[in-house]
Curated annotation (Swiss-Prot):
Protein name: Photosystem II reaction center protein H
Description of post-translational modifications: Phosphorylation is a light-dependent reaction catalyzed by a membrane-bound kinase; phosphorylation occurs on Thr residue(s) in the N-terminus of the protein.
Chain segments annotated as transmembrane: 41-61
Record keywords, A-Z: Chloroplast, Membrane, Phosphoprotein, Photosynthesis, Photosystem II, Plastid, Thylakoid, Transmembrane, Transmembrane helix
Function: One of the components of the core complex of photosystem II (PSII), required for its stability and/or assembly. PSII is a light-driven water:plastoquinone oxidoreductase that uses light energy to abstract electrons from H(2)O, generating O(2) and a proton gradient subsequently used for ATP formation. It consists of a core antenna complex that captures photons, and an electron transfer chain that converts photonic excitation into a charge separation.
UniProt subunit comment: PSII is composed of 1 copy each of membrane proteins PsbA, PsbB, PsbC, PsbD, PsbE, PsbF, PsbH, PsbI, PsbJ, PsbK, PsbL, PsbM, PsbT, PsbX, PsbY, PsbZ, Psb30/Ycf12, at least 3 peripheral proteins of the oxygen-evolving complex and a large number of cofactors. It forms dimeric complexes.
Record GO terms (molecular function): phosphate ion binding
Family: Belongs to the PsbH family.
SUPFAM superfamilies linked: Photosystem II 10 kDa phosphoprotein PsbH
PANTHER family, alphabetized: PHOTOSYSTEM II REACTION CENTER PROTEIN H
């Protein structure tokens, strides 16, 4: 068969590094959700501004906005 069983004793354990020890407290909140809406409205505003930016770029690309002093080929 293509499946291979690995015994627990033969597995290599992950090394503990100083960077890992420094970053471990930052990962302690993993999976926890803050109550309420949190930063959802801020993310919605950022998405709306990004959509407006993309539509402006698309309109310039399609030459549907004429800019004074800039010649388009």
């Amino acid at each position: 068969m293509a499946t291979q069983t690995v015994e627990d004793s033969s597995r290599a354990r992950p090394r503990q590094t100083s960077v890992g020890s420094l970053l471990k407290p930052l990962n302690s909140e993993y999976g926890k959700v803050a109550p309420g809406w949190g930063t959802t409205p801020l993310m919605g505003i950022a998405m709306a501004l990004f959509a407006i930016f993309l539509s402006i770029i698309l309109e310039i690309y399609n030459s549907s906005i004429l800019l004074d002093g800039i010649s388009m080929n």
